[in-house]
Protein backbone atom coordinates (compact mmCIF):
# COMPACT_ATOMS: atom_id res chain seq x y z
CA UNK A 1 0.00 0.00 0.00
CA UNK A 2 2.84 2.45 0.76
CA UNK A 3 4.12 2.08 -2.80
CA UNK A 4 0.98 3.59 -4.27
CA UNK A 5 1.13 6.51 -1.82
CA UNK A 6 4.83 7.00 -2.52
CA UNK A 7 4.28 7.04 -6.28
CA UNK A 8 1.32 9.40 -5.94
CA UNK A 9 3.49 11.79 -3.96
CA UNK A 10 6.20 11.68 -6.63
CA UNK A 11 3.75 12.69 -9.34
CA UNK A 12 2.15 15.37 -7.19
CA UNK A 13 -1.10 13.70 -6.13
CA UNK A 14 -2.17 13.88 -2.47
CA UNK A 15 -1.19 10.75 -0.53
CA UNK A 16 -3.83 10.57 2.13
CA UNK A 17 -4.18 14.23 3.02
CA UNK A 18 -1.14 14.66 5.26
CA UNK A 19 2.33 15.96 4.54
CA UNK A 20 5.65 15.00 6.05
CA UNK A 21 6.99 17.74 8.30
CA UNK A 22 9.69 19.90 6.72
CA UNK A 23 13.15 18.52 7.33
CA UNK A 24 16.41 20.43 7.17
CA UNK A 25 19.68 18.68 6.40
CA UNK A 26 22.59 18.99 8.80
CA UNK A 27 23.87 22.60 8.64
CA UNK A 28 25.53 23.24 5.30
CA UNK A 29 24.72 19.78 4.00
CA UNK A 30 23.19 19.50 0.57
CA UNK A 31 23.85 17.77 -2.69
CA UNK A 32 27.00 19.05 -4.37
CA UNK A 33 27.17 19.65 -8.10
CA UNK A 34 27.67 16.37 -9.89
CA UNK A 35 25.90 13.04 -10.02
CA UNK A 36 24.46 11.18 -7.05
CA UNK A 37 25.06 7.45 -6.82
CA UNK A 38 22.06 5.51 -5.51
CA UNK A 39 23.25 2.14 -4.21
CA UNK A 40 20.68 -0.50 -3.36
CA UNK A 41 20.83 -3.93 -1.79
CA UNK A 42 17.53 -5.75 -2.07
CA UNK A 43 16.31 -9.27 -1.46
CA UNK A 44 12.63 -8.94 -2.36
CA UNK A 45 12.69 -5.86 -4.62
CA UNK A 46 11.48 -3.27 -2.11
CA UNK A 47 14.85 -1.47 -1.90
CA UNK A 48 15.09 -1.53 -5.71
CA UNK A 49 11.63 0.03 -6.01
CA UNK A 50 12.56 2.72 -3.49
CA UNK A 51 15.87 3.38 -5.29
CA UNK A 52 13.99 3.90 -8.57
CA UNK A 53 11.54 6.25 -6.82
CA UNK A 54 14.45 8.17 -5.25
CA UNK A 55 16.11 8.49 -8.66
CA UNK A 56 12.85 9.86 -10.08
CA UNK A 57 12.59 12.31 -7.18
CA UNK A 58 16.07 13.63 -7.97
CA UNK A 59 15.44 13.71 -11.73
CA UNK A 60 12.32 15.81 -11.15
CA UNK A 61 14.48 18.61 -9.70
CA UNK A 62 17.28 18.28 -12.24
CA UNK A 63 19.78 16.21 -10.27
CA UNK A 64 21.63 13.56 -12.25
CA UNK A 65 21.81 10.19 -10.54
CA UNK A 66 22.31 6.55 -11.31
CA UNK A 67 21.25 3.40 -9.53
CA UNK A 68 23.76 0.61 -8.88
CA UNK A 69 23.07 -2.58 -7.00
CA UNK A 70 25.59 -3.92 -4.53
CA UNK A 71 26.75 -6.61 -6.96
CA UNK A 72 28.28 -3.79 -9.03
CA UNK A 73 29.54 -1.78 -6.04
CA UNK A 74 33.15 -1.99 -4.91
CA UNK A 75 35.67 -0.07 -2.83
CA UNK A 76 37.10 1.83 -5.83
CA UNK A 77 33.64 3.06 -6.85
CA UNK A 78 32.99 4.37 -3.35
CA UNK A 79 36.45 5.93 -3.03
CA UNK A 80 35.80 8.00 -6.17
CA UNK A 81 32.17 8.88 -5.37
CA UNK A 82 31.40 12.11 -3.57
CA UNK A 83 27.73 11.54 -2.73
CA UNK A 84 25.77 8.33 -2.31
CA UNK A 85 22.29 7.41 -1.17
CA UNK A 86 22.20 3.85 0.19
CA UNK A 87 18.94 1.89 0.30
CA UNK A 88 19.58 -1.50 1.88
CA UNK A 89 17.51 -4.31 3.26
CA UNK A 90 18.39 -6.83 5.92
CA UNK A 91 17.45 -10.47 5.55
CA UNK A 92 16.71 -12.94 8.30
CA UNK A 93 18.55 -12.04 11.48
CA UNK A 94 20.90 -9.24 10.41
CA UNK A 95 22.24 -10.68 7.16
CA UNK A 96 22.86 -8.67 3.99
CA UNK A 97 20.75 -9.49 0.94
CA UNK A 98 22.31 -12.04 -1.42
CA UNK A 99 23.40 -9.28 -3.82
CA UNK A 100 25.40 -7.61 -1.00
CA UNK A 101 26.94 -10.71 0.58
CA UNK A 102 30.27 -10.41 -1.28
CA UNK A 103 30.46 -6.66 -0.60
CA UNK A 104 29.77 -7.27 3.08
CA UNK A 105 32.31 -10.07 3.35
CA UNK A 106 35.15 -8.46 1.36
CA UNK A 107 34.76 -4.68 1.04
CA UNK A 108 33.43 -4.13 4.55
CA UNK A 109 36.09 -6.39 6.10
CA UNK A 110 38.23 -3.32 6.82
CA UNK A 111 37.73 0.46 6.63
CA UNK A 112 38.28 2.26 3.34
CA UNK A 113 39.41 5.83 2.59
CA UNK A 114 36.05 7.54 2.20
CA UNK A 115 36.65 10.96 3.81
CA UNK A 116 35.27 12.92 0.82
CA UNK A 117 32.08 10.82 0.71
CA UNK A 118 28.74 12.22 1.91
CA UNK A 119 25.85 9.81 2.23
CA UNK A 120 22.31 9.09 3.32
CA UNK A 121 21.18 5.64 4.39
CA UNK A 122 17.75 4.02 4.38
CA UNK A 123 17.80 0.68 6.20
CA UNK A 124 14.90 -1.70 5.62
CA UNK A 125 14.12 -4.44 8.11
CA UNK A 126 11.58 -6.33 10.15
CA UNK A 127 11.39 -5.90 13.95
CA UNK A 128 10.28 -9.51 14.14
CA UNK A 129 13.97 -10.41 13.90
CA UNK A 130 16.38 -9.86 16.77
CA UNK A 131 18.97 -7.98 14.67
CA UNK A 132 16.59 -5.40 13.18
CA UNK A 133 18.19 -3.56 10.23
CA UNK A 134 21.45 -5.36 11.05
CA UNK A 135 23.01 -4.94 7.61
CA UNK A 136 22.01 -1.27 7.40
CA UNK A 137 23.49 -0.62 10.84
CA UNK A 138 26.70 -2.49 9.95
CA UNK A 139 27.02 -0.55 6.68
CA UNK A 140 26.50 2.76 8.51
CA UNK A 141 29.17 1.86 11.09
CA UNK A 142 31.60 0.83 8.32
CA UNK A 143 30.98 4.06 6.38
CA UNK A 144 31.64 6.15 9.50
CA UNK A 145 34.76 4.13 10.36
CA UNK A 146 35.91 4.79 6.79
CA UNK A 147 35.61 8.56 7.27
CA UNK A 148 32.40 9.12 5.29
CA UNK A 149 30.02 11.76 6.65
CA UNK A 150 26.27 11.19 6.91
CA UNK A 151 23.98 13.98 5.77
CA UNK A 152 21.42 12.86 8.35
CA UNK A 153 20.99 10.02 10.85
CA UNK A 154 20.25 6.61 9.35
CA UNK A 155 16.53 6.08 8.72
CA UNK A 156 15.28 2.63 9.71
CA UNK A 157 12.10 1.22 8.20
CA UNK A 158 10.14 -1.55 9.90
CA UNK A 159 8.21 -3.58 7.33
CA UNK A 160 7.63 -0.73 4.85
CA UNK A 161 6.53 1.80 7.52
CA UNK A 162 5.04 4.77 5.64
CA UNK A 163 6.15 7.38 8.22
CA UNK A 164 9.80 6.31 7.97
CA UNK A 165 9.60 6.35 4.18
CA UNK A 166 8.16 9.87 4.34
CA UNK A 167 11.16 10.91 6.47
CA UNK A 168 13.48 9.52 3.79
CA UNK A 169 11.62 11.40 1.07
CA UNK A 170 11.72 14.60 3.14
CA UNK A 171 15.47 14.29 3.81
CA UNK A 172 16.22 13.76 0.11
CA UNK A 173 13.99 16.72 -0.77
CA UNK A 174 15.76 18.92 1.80
CA UNK A 175 19.16 18.00 0.37
CA UNK A 176 17.90 18.72 -3.15
CA UNK A 177 16.10 21.98 -2.30
CA UNK A 178 19.11 24.30 -2.85
CA UNK A 179 19.75 22.69 -6.25
CA UNK A 180 16.08 22.99 -7.21
CA UNK A 181 15.97 26.63 -6.04
CA UNK A 182 19.04 27.49 -8.09
CA UNK A 183 17.51 25.77 -11.12
CA UNK A 184 14.22 27.64 -10.68
CA UNK A 185 15.84 31.02 -9.92
CA UNK A 186 19.36 31.04 -11.45
CA UNK A 187 19.78 34.84 -11.19
CA UNK A 188 19.24 34.84 -7.41
CA UNK A 189 22.19 32.49 -6.98
CA UNK A 190 24.45 35.06 -8.66
CA UNK A 191 23.40 38.09 -6.56
CA UNK A 192 25.76 39.17 -3.79
CA UNK A 193 24.38 38.75 -0.28
Predicted regions and their residues:
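FMN-binding flavodoxin-like domain, especially the glycine-rich phosphate-binding loop
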Residues: 1-35, 45-46, 61, 80-81, ...
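Conserved active-site segments centered on acidic
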Residues: 39
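Short amphipathic alpha-helical segments with coiled-coil-like heptad repeat character
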Residues: 55-56, 151
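A short, well-structured beta->alpha microelement
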Residues: 58-77
Amino acid sequence: MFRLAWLRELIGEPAGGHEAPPVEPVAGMRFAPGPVLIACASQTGVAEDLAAATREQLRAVGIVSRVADFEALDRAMLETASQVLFLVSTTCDGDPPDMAATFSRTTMAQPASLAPLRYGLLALGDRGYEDFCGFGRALDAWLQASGAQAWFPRIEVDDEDAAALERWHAQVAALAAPVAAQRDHPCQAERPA
